[in-house]
A protein has these predicted regions:
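A short, Lys/Arg-rich alpha-helix, primarily the initiator
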Residues: 1-21
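Helix-turn-helix/winged-helix DNA-binding modules
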Residues: 19, 46-49, 60
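Residues within the helices of the helix-turn-helix
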Residues: 14, 25, 55
Length: 77
C-alpha cells in the first residue's frame, strides 16, 4: 500500500501568545487547561486536537480557529 501524505496541521498558539502579550500561566488559567498541555500546544507536540480545548483557547484569546491552526498541504513528490 502506498504511503500517502495528506499534509499537516501547524499550531500557531505560541505566535498568538506573543502577539497578545499574555503569559502562559494566565492563558492556562483562562482556558482551564494544564500548563503542560498548553506547552504541548505551543511546541506543536500535541498528538490529538480536542475541539473543546480549541474552543476554550479561542475564547480566552478572543480569536478565530484559523488564528490558531494552519493547514500545510503536502509537497509534490
Amino acid at each position: 500500500m502506498e504511503d500517502l501524505n495528506y499534509g499537516s496541521i501547524r499550531i500557531k498558539l505560541d505566535e498568538m501568545i506573543k502577539k497578545q502579550g499574555i503569559s502562559k500561566n494566565k492563558l492556562a488559567h483562562r482556558a482551564e487547561m494544564q500548563r503542560t498541555q498548553l506547552n504541548q500546544f505551543c511546541k506543536g507536540t500535541v498528538t490529538r486536537l480536542d475541539t473543546a480545548v480549541l474552543a476554550r483557547l479561542c475564547y480566552a484569546l478572543d480569536c478565530k480557529i484559523e488564528d490558531l491552526l494552519e493547514y500545510i498541504p503536502p509537497e509534490n513528490k
